[in-house]
From Swiss-Prot:
Its main location: nucleus. One of its GO terms (cellular component) is nucleus. Putative transcription factor that may be involved in the regulation of the expression of the gene cluster that mediates the biosynthesis of phenalenones such as herqueinone, compounds that have been reported to treat tumors, bacterial infections and/or mycoses, and rheumatic diseases. Residues 522-577 are annotated as: Disordered. It is found in: Nucleus. InterPro entries: AtrR-like (IPR050987). Residues 523-547, 563-577 have a biased composition (Low complexity). Keywords: Nucleus, Transcription, Transcription regulation. Residues 548-559 have a biased composition (Pro residues). One of its GO terms (molecular function) is DNA-binding transcription factor activity. CDD domains: fungal_TF_MHR. The keyword Transcription applies. This is Putative transcription factor phnE.
Length: 815
């Protein structure tokens, strides 16, 4: 029991003791009241009545005695009045004590409800299938470095699964499962000692240098055009002015944060299309500049707006380069938030202490920076349990149209965290608050998720993933983990990643994907009719009598309400895949653990679930997790190198690898994708596909589940990837707009428009590996390093070869 409840009990007992003593005195006075009344009566009646009838009460011969009797009678009247007033005071005190006892009782009831929720005793709200609310503190081998992992982080989820599986007592596989779980937890706790220096060789004599101005001009145009909630942190005119100022005086040490920003803009823009190679002669100098900036504490500690912007881009770059080392990017992001608070960016309208010194453009840019940091912080808290570094947004008004939907969702997530993380609400108040939050989330969904984005855009997929992650977060807190809609949110989250990052898709996954999208949109679900609204039409359903979703030829474009009109005849073309690093940061990590528990038939605390599950549903979910694992393994990293290991570079992918192996071990005797040999059906339409998929994902107990490259695929069935099935008349789930077919370049992922938006004509065609732009700027590989030398001769040479920023921008506008 908490200390507050104990103090309330003590106060109540004290008041009870005092009340008993007071009531005892009242009872004594009540018992004494008849005797007092008799004494008063005798004094009022006088000596005559006291002597008996027939006797005179006043001695006529003694006038002094008569006067004394009158005095005694007059003196008795105030005494009677005082006695009556004392009883009125007693009644008032009784009323006051009754009110105090009522308040104490109500306070005690509220404290008892709080104790029940915290201690998980007797209250339904207490049995939450979540990790311990205190989280985990992990130390390194020497105990010098300690890191806190909150209750929704990846490590906490692994620890919770370890606790849930501890009660699983299957004798033939218990030891193997325990070993796999321990390995998963240890892998999650391990923090690699990766740094920028481990991915490239340092160039002697080259520090933090400016990139070629012509390259920067091209990349800045693409960067600003494709800016999203994470990169929309610059005022365009201010950025162009900074470029002119820095290149006029490149040796000014005060402009070093801008030099870091320029290099990061190029790296992030190039990495949005292709995996960067650390050995590339053009990428190496930019990585060298970033590494030099990382060692300059003064550069990243000064409370300047450009320092916050540089840290914001730096953290985004590190999170994509090193997805297996979360503290590396999270620490840089935390420093950006600390500087933002020191500068007063969370204040209304971005003002500082003296708002008159800021222009309208500066106010807008400060607000952009704060919005971007705030959105990223709330998104990370919802999807992966990151710490909150920025205060809430109650005092902030207005938002840029480019990030309006993200801004509103982030504010809604902030409200959700405050409500679900508060202990001041009772059970009934909490349910009312949660219902109100669900309604607000539904309103946001109808306003922002349906009609305001284009098919296959990076921004749209991220919005959908974050919306699903928010709904999963609310359902997890309210113990709604067995409902079909909750499981469908987890399945759709996995399918969004698979569809966005995989060339081809299994037809049953494609049907399930479109059906879940239709159910996600209430207006579309109602318009499609009751025939398609049944949850049994998904491959994971327990019933097969309901009709399947409409065929591929009749489906609307995914994540879009209205089909855009065609501008011409189309030709077959593979859809452009989205980069996994950005999508992985928006993926709700809880989804894979929920599906794994559903497959294994356990809930939190290791208890069996009551939901009816079919073999078809279990097999479908297993294949879904395996397909997601292959998606993590098959996608190239954001930054690669010749010495890079072949294992999955994503921490979530490594955990998913262990999770799939645990599922295989625990379901080997019941059902799994390799159980077709025992006659159990799989979720495929033909026997040939059943045999293929069972061999595709089957792993021996002696080899890790992540080693999918070593599986025995028949060469007459497989193609480039295990999921590239040769299916006639199979239509890709993502439509290819006509405007993408005429472009000769691979476009960058757009934030507001389609991924297929053609790139600018001056944008160079970036080869896969290595990245070589020497022909574009008129020099060979041998003298490529001279580009980054800011000496007088080299600078003059480059100025003769590249146009000025003003002429370059005029050239873009003419295009």
């Amino acid at each position: 029991m908490s200390g507050g409840a104990i103090s309330i009990f003590g106060e109540l007992n004290a008041h009870t003791y005092l009340g008993k003593a007071f009531f005892s005195s009242i009872n004594y006075k009540i018992h004494q009241w008849p005797e007092c009344r008799r004494r008063l009566g005798r004094r009022l009646m006088g000596p005559a009545q006291a002597a008996g009838p027939g006797k005179s009460s006043v001695d006529e011969r003694n006038p002094n005695a008569a006067a004394a009797t009158e005095i005694n009678t007059n003196a008795s009247i105030p005494l009677l009045q005082r006695e009556c007033e004392s009883f009125d005071e007693i009644q008032d005190r009784l009323t006051m004590m009754q009110d105090q006892l009522s308040r104490l009782t109500a306070t005690l009831d509220n404290k008892q409800n709080l104790v029940d929720r915290v201690d998980q005793i007797g209250d339904k709200q207490s049995s939450m299938p979540t990790p311990p609310s205190t989280g985990h503190v992990v130390s390194d081998v020497d105990g010098q470095i300690q890191r806190y992992h909150g209750p929704w982080t990846l490590l906490a989820q692994c620890r919770q699964l370890e606790s849930d599986l501890a009660s699983w007592s299957k004798a033939d596989h218990a030891a193997e499962v325990a070993s796999l779980v321990t390995s998963m937890v240890q892998e999650t706790m391990r923090v690699p000692s990766s740094s920028l220096s481990s991915f490239h060789t340092e160039i002697p004599g080259m520090g933090m240098c400016l990139p070629p101005r012509q390259l920067l001009s091209v990349m800045v145009e693409c960067f600003l055009k494709n800016a999203d909630y994470a990169t929309s942190i610059f005022d365009h005119q201010s950025l162009y002015c900074a470029i002119d100022r820095v290149y006029r005086d490149p040796s000014n040490p005060e402009e070093k944060p801008w030099v870091l920003c320029f290099n990061l803009i190029i790296l992030l823009t190039l990495g949005a299309e292709h995996s960067l190679q650390s050995e590339d002669p053009f990428v190496r100098p930019m990585l060298q500049a970033v590494q030099t900036a990382a060692g300059n504490s003064r550069l990243l500690m000064e409370p300047r707006l450009v320092s916050v912007q540089a840290l914001a881009l730096f953290s985004l770059f590190m999170q994509q380069c090193y997805p297996d080392n979360e503290p590396l990017g999270d620490g840089i992001f935390a420093q950006a938030c600390v500087l933002a608070r020191q500068m007063g960016l969370p204040q209304p309208h971005g003002y500082a202490a003296t708002p008159s010194t800021l222009t309208a453009a500066e106010v807008d840019e400060r607000h952009r920076v704060y919005q971007s940091l705030y959105i990223r912080n709330r998104y990370a808290t919802t999807t992966s349990g990151a710490l909150m570094w920025l205060p809430n947004s109650i005092m902030c008004t207005g938002t840029a149209s480019a990030v309006g939907a993200h801004w509103e969702l982030a504010k809604l997530q902030d409200e959700i965290h405050r409500v679900l993380g508060s202990c001041s609400f009772g059970s009934s108040d909490r349910r009312i608050k949660v219902a109100q939050l669900r309604e607000k989330l539904r309103v946001w969904q109808e306003a922002c998720l349906v009609a305001e984005t284009q098919p296959m855009s990076m921004d749209r997929v991220i919005l959908c993933l974050l919306f699903l992650g928010t709904r999963i977060y609310i359902s997890m807190d309210n113990k709604e983990t067995d409902t079909e809609s909750f499981l469908d949110d987890c399945r759709l989250s996995c399918l969004l990643l698979i569809v966005s990052c995989t060339k081809h898709l299994r037809p049953d996954f494609s049907n399930q994907f479109h059906h879940l999208l239709r159910r996600l949109n209430p207006s579309r679900r109602n318009s499609d009719g009751s025939a398609h609204s049944s949850p049994s039409s998904t491959p994971s359903s327990s019933s097969t009598s309901s009709p399947l979703p409409s065929p591929a030829s009749e489906r609307p474009p995914p994540l879009d309400v209205v089909t855009r009109p065609s501008t011409g005849t189309s030709t077959p073309s593979s859809p452009t895949l989205l980069p996994l690093p950005r999508l992985a940061n928006a993926f709700p990590i809880t989804a894979i653990f929920i599906l794994a528990r559903h497959i294994l038939g356990i809930s939190a605390e290791g208890k069996p679930i009551n939901t009816h599950r079919t073999v078809t549903e279990i097999n479908s979910d297993i294949l879904l997790l395996e397909s997601l694992l292959f998606c993590f393994q098959n996608n190239p990293p954001f930054l690669g190198g010749k010495d890079q290991t072949l294992h999955c570079s994503y921490k979530l992918g490594q955990v998913l690898d262990h999770l799939v192996r645990i599922v295989h071990t625990m379901t080997s005797d019941r059902t799994s994708p390799r159980a077709h040999a025992s006659g159990l059906p799989l979720v495929t339409e033909h026997a040939e596909m059943t045999d293929y998929m069972s061999r595709m994902f089957m792993t021996s107990k002696g080899s890790p589940a992540s080693d999918l490259t070593g599986l025995w695929y028949p060469r007459d069935v497989t193609s480039d990837t295990p999921m590239e099935l040769s299916i006639p008349d199979f239509q890709s789930v993502w439509p290819t707009p006509q405007d993408s077919l005429a472009s000769s370049t691979n476009p960058l992922a757009t934030a507001e428009g389609s991924i297929y938006t053609p790139a600018l004509h001056p944008t160079p065609i970036i080869p896969n590996t290595p990245l070589d732009l020497s022909e574009l700027f008129g020099f060979t590989n041998s003298d490529a390093s001279e580009v980054w030398n800011l000496g007088t001769e080299t600078t003059d040479l480059l100025e003769n070869r590249r146009p000025s920023l003003k002429r370059q921008r005029t050239h873009f506008e003419s295009q």
